[in-house]
Amino acid sequence: MLERIVTRIGISPFSAQQHLGVYRSFLVSVFIAKHFNGETFLRIDDTNPRHQANIDALIDDLTQIIEPSLLDSPRNSETGIYYVGSDSIPAIFESQRFELYRKYLNILQEHELLIHEADAIYFDTKKYIELYGDLIDLQYQSKPYRSGLITKSLPQLYFPIAVDNGRRFLWHFASVIDDNAFDVTHIVRAKDKIDNQVPQTILNRALGFTLPQYLYTKIMLSGHPLPKIIDLTATGISIQAIRSYLYGTITGNSEKPYFSFEEALMDFSPKSVTPGQFYFDFKKLQSVQKHFFNHQKPSD
């Protein structure tokens, strides 16, 4: 029996729209949490001024794919929780949590694990290797009940954790702090993101945190750039069909029309969450769209 499951969805608003593969990974986080009667919450990296204008558009897209009622308010929510969008979704805003980040930055400084260069602050991997060795075990789960291990040799390189003289913290540092603060148990993402696990594992161990489980799911591919929601709706595909298609790629029934998340959750098995890849199938999406169109009520 698994412990209480807590997952999180992390948005980096570098673009006003994300492609379908990103939203599929978000949905897998929700399916895993809800299957085990757990929680999932939203975290927003809003510290780059150039990306601020994209947040509202991303929230609009997100709430079309993930029902707002499925997102929970984080526990231990001492600071940085705001309500966003027309549905007032609780979300952690990174820009409001600097005091906590600075606390842990100071801890790393006390352990002489930081290097200051120009206006940036780097984690000193060379010093870490002196203390802990140059091999790091990346524990991950290919399925919620099946663990794996990848051992990597660490390069003697530095990686940045803060810029602007410590006034802006980078995602792979801030997310580690927040995941610990909010008791996140599982990080769910596509297998192509496994390299992100290296700095996150290093930081977790250097700070004495309990490592979350890393669960990897399939990568959605396409012979062309993956479509965004706005691209598909412009062709007449409904949000309901897009959502149903994504549900189906997770349950293994991509041509089955799903009218609700609860219906899809009944077909969901954690065993279906495996690393690998699959291709976006526009014809299957069109088939789902046709089904919804044929089953519309006259008043719809």
Question: Residue ranges of each PLM-predicted region?
Answer:
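Active-site cores that bind ATP or allylic diphosphates and position pyrophosphate for catalysis
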Residues: 94, 107-229
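Long, contiguous hydrophobic alpha-helical segments, chiefly transmembrane helices and signal peptides
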Residues: 40-42, 173, 187-188, 199, ...
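Short, mixed-charge, low-aromatic patches
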Residues: 13-20, 47, 151-161, 201, ...
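N-terminal Rossmann-like or analogous alpha/beta NTP/dinucleotide-binding catalytic cores
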Residues: 2-120, 195-209, 241
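Intrinsically disordered, low-complexity acidic/polar segments
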Residues: 16, 130-132, 294
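Short, histidine-centered active-site or binding-site loop motifs used for metal coordination
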Residues: 9-13, 44-46, 177, 181, ...
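Short, charged/polar micro-motifs that form catalytic or ligand-binding hotspots
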Residues: 19, 190, 232
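Catalytic adenosine-cofactor/nucleotide-binding cores of aminoacyl-tRNA synthetases and other
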Residues: 195, 201, 205-300
